[in-house]
Amino acid sequence: LLVLAMGSALRSTAQTEERVDQRLARNDELRVTSSFLQSVLGRISGQRAAGITSVDENPFLLRADAKELVWVGVMPARYGAAGRQFFRLSLANTGNSASLVLQFMPMDEPVLPSGWEGATTEVLVRDVMDLALQYQDAGQDKPEWQSVWESKERLPTHVLISLATRSNGAWPPMVVAMRPLIGSDPFAAGMATFGGSR
């Protein structure tokens, strides 16, 4: 009986340690991913797209819906990609599951890319079951989260990133403030208006 009790206690301890290790790994992955997205998404260009001929067209270099976000920004210096870049945050198939990926490539001209075949791809989170993106303009009297950003006059000031993985379930929501890059501030350049503070 003593041997059985000791064996049961050891198994229980091992299971507890495994759960703690999993929780620590999840927290570390969340911290790293959140920090990286804050640094990349936190600086967005307000530059207008070239070739706009209709008031019905989106004048900004931005495409934002519930499953994909495309924007122009700059990669933090420590990652080595200099200059303004097109970025794309979305889900992509990697192996037998989906992953949250960030794709980026140099902005050679102010026109949204039609394809991403030549882009660099970084896998941020693997084994993702669901991704939902929402956008908000904090400068409005009653800001509301929107699954698709359709404004032709303003860029969103915040993005809410919600995702769930197969192993850990739903992550805590990540809210990132999207601030205009120096030189693309519409208040200084006479372009369309951003909401919120600069």
Regions found by a protein language model. Give the residues of each.
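N-terminal single-pass transmembrane signal-anchor helix
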Residues: 1-10
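A short, structured loop/turn motif at beta-sheet edges
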Residues: 90-98, 123-130, 166-167
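Short aromatic-glycine motifs in intrinsically disordered, low-complexity regions
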Residues: 109-123
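Short linear sequence signals and composition-biased patches located at protein termini or domain-edge surfaces
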Residues: 129-198
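A short, surface-exposed interaction/processing loop segment used at functional sites
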Residues: 102, 107-112, 189-195
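Extracytoplasmic beta-strand-rich oligomerization domains located immediately C-terminal to a leader/signal peptide
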Residues: 10-109
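Structured surface patches comprising rigid loops and adjacent beta-strands/short helices at the edges
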Residues: 47, 119-135
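Short beta-strand segments
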Residues: 85-87, 120-122, 170-176
